[in-house]
């Protein structure tokens, strides 16, 4: 598989010689008014759908993953034995796990954020220091949500709070 050419976020796990990148969208979409963007059928075709795991030292891609829906921020677990990260998708409102198992990297969708039909648009994510919870702030509905990720393969929403009309 080939990466789609968009770059957005990057995280590194130096202990695993890995760098991970997401592919939200290109500059033109990023700078466009959101209302105009959502109504522009051509612009809506210009979103990324890949996450790339790179060799950190050589800066060469090791594996390209299909992560449909425009992956945004990447956050990695803090624990020294926790070789996994999360990303969320802007257009499909999914939580994706990027994880290492038996020295191979994999991805899987592990949770849904709000009502995807309403495009909540997750814009900020954070993992708690104990790697047990993932905070997700969503732009379009002004919500903050907390997911229990003590089992990273099964994110469960445990808290929701309205912050405002838009975050």
Regions found by a protein language model. Name each.
Residues 1-14:
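Asp-box/WD-like beta-propeller blade repeats and closely related beta-sheet repeat scaffolds
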Residues 56-59, 100-103, 149-152:
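Short loop/turn segments that connect beta-strands within beta-propeller blades
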Residues 24, 88-91, 139:
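Short loop/turn segments immediately following the C-termini of beta-strands
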Residues 9, 73-76, 124:
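Conserved beta-strand position repeated once per blade in WD40 beta-propeller domains
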Residues 93, 118-167:
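Loop/turn-rich, solvent-exposed surfaces of beta-rich toroidal or solenoidal domains
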Residues 15-17, 81-83, 130-132:
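Short coil/turn segments that connect the beta-strands within blades of beta-propeller domains
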Residues 2-3, 61-70, 106-120, 159-167:
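Surface-exposed loop and turn segments in beta-propeller and other repeat-based domains
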Residues 21-46:
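Short, conserved, GDST-rich strand-edge loop motifs in beta-rich repeat architectures
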């Amino acid at each position: 598989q080939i990466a789609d050419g968009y770059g957005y976020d990057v995280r590194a796990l130096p202990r695993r010689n890995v760098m991970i990148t997401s592919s939200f969208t290109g500059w033109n979409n990023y700078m466009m008014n959101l209302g105009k963007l959502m109504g522009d059928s051509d612009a809506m075709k210009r979103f990324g759908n890949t996450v790339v795991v790179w060799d950190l030292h050589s800066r060469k891609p090791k594996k390209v993953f299909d992560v449909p829906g425009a992956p945004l921020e990447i956050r990695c677990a803090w624990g020294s034995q926790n070789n996994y990260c999360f990303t969320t998708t802007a257009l499909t409102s999914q939580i994706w796990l990027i994880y290492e198992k038996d020295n191979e990297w994999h991805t899987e969708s592990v949770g849904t954020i709000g009502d995807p039909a309403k495009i909540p648009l997750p814009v900020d994510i954070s993992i708690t220091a104990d790697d047990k919870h993932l905070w997700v702030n969503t732009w379009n509905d002004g919500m903050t949500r907390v997911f229990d990720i003590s089992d990273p393969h099964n994110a469960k929403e445990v808290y929701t709070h309205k912050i405002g009309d838009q975050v």
